[in-house]
UniProtKB/Swiss-Prot annotation:
A single cellular component GO annotation: extracellular region
Species classification: Eukaryota, Metazoa, Ecdysozoa, Arthropoda, Chelicerata
GO biological process assignments: defense response to bacterium; killing of cells of another organism
Protein name: M-lycotoxin-Hc2a
Record's function text: Forms pore that permeabilize the cell membrane. Promotes efflux of calcium from synaptosomes, causes hemolysis, and dissipates voltage gradients across muscle membrane. Potently inhibits the growth of bacteria, yeast and Leishmania. May function both in the prey capture strategy as well as protection from infectious organisms arising from prey ingestion.
Length: 27
């Protein structure tokens, strides 16, 4: 269970980074 939570956390971090990149580069 904890491993899954860690995975979700890293995935969320990755998505957030991608979103920020898109936001900064898109505008």
């Amino acid at each position: 269970k904890i491993k899954w939570f860690k995975t979700m956390k890293s995935i969320a971090k990755f998505i957030a980074k991608e979103q920020m990149k898109k936001h900064l580069g898109g505008e």
